[in-house]
UniProtKB/Swiss-Prot annotation:
Signal peptide residues on this chain, from the entry's feature table: none
Protein's UniProt keywords contain NADP: no
Extracellular face residues: 1-25, 76-97, 161-205, 262-268
Gene that this polypeptide is encoded by: OR5K4
Name of this protein: Olfactory receptor 5K4
Pfam family, one: 7tm_4
Cell location: Cell membrane
Transmembrane segments: 26-46, 55-75, 98-118, 140-160, 206-226, 241-261, 269-289
Protein function: Odorant receptor.
Regions of this protein lying in the Cytoplasmic compartment: 47-54, 119-139, 227-240, 290-321
Cystine pairings recorded for this chain: C97-C179
Keywords: Cell membrane, Disulfide bond, G-protein coupled receptor, Glycoprotein, Membrane, Olfaction, Receptor, Sensory transduction, Transducer, Transmembrane, Transmembrane helix
Taxonomic placement: Eukaryota, Metazoa, Chordata, Craniata, Vertebrata
Positions bearing carbohydrate: N5
Amino acid sequence: MARENHSLAAEFILIGFTNYPELKTLLFVVFSAIYLVTMVGNLGLVALIYVERRLLTPMYIFLGNLALMDSCCSCAVTPKMLENFFSEDRIISLYECMAQFYFLCLAETTDCFLLATMAYDRYVAICHPLQYHTMMSKTLCIRMTTGAFKAGNLHSMIHVGLLLRLTFCRSNKIHHFFCDILPLYRLSCTDPSINELMIYIFSIPIQIFTIATVLISYLCILLTVFKMKSKEGRGKAFSTCASHFLSVSIFYICLLMYIGPSEEGDKDTPVAIFYAIVIPLLNPFIYSLRNKEVINVLKKIMRNYNILKQTCSIANLFLIY
């Protein structure tokens, strides 16, 4: 019991960006702006998809859930990081560590499966357009989305639960800007071999399965596109897949670089910033700027807003006179 209490009472210090005290204010402003734009962009995209009925198709349902998970990822990491810029102690408890890692792992794992389902959706749309509504029914879409969330939740709970078997009696300084699981293992005085084994057992198969799904889907798409005789058809197919392929490439390159072997946590910081903070910022723009349907819906909303604004102005004039 004493050992368990010692583990649960542990507190850690997030070193973060303390090596750059002269840039503290600038970094706070930059990351605050990124956080604000990320939340507005992702939650705005979610609202747009679920309010506009014609966007309630499998592709946009997956996209809306991806945006929701990007918001979750940003919320898990950024607020505590911003607080620590002006905090004297920068302390985080084990409970906070577990919660932070749980939501981050949930978001990243669910993202992996959602990106794979989006690749499969594009494969069906381009390679089997006549059977699309049969092969990608709303029921299947909901099941795939629910499955992605369940897998993310289970994966997170396993790793967070295994943290309870560790005790921390070494340095309590985490050389990172958030409470990631690998830096925690370095501080454990209990052998974390079982925890590390669970990463290999669960995380690596998830990566292999989702990456293989994406690669096979795009290989089939490329073979189908090259067989198309119409240049317009090829252009439309490439345009449909370009944003998703760009997002997938950035996500997996950063993720694979981050989970690669590293002895010091601070060496992971630049890559972690990119995959935990920058990617959630970029995704709404990657998917929206090249998407005619989303742009048309935005234009429609802006037109309605301008009409409403003009109507209110005219009504105010009548009230004045």
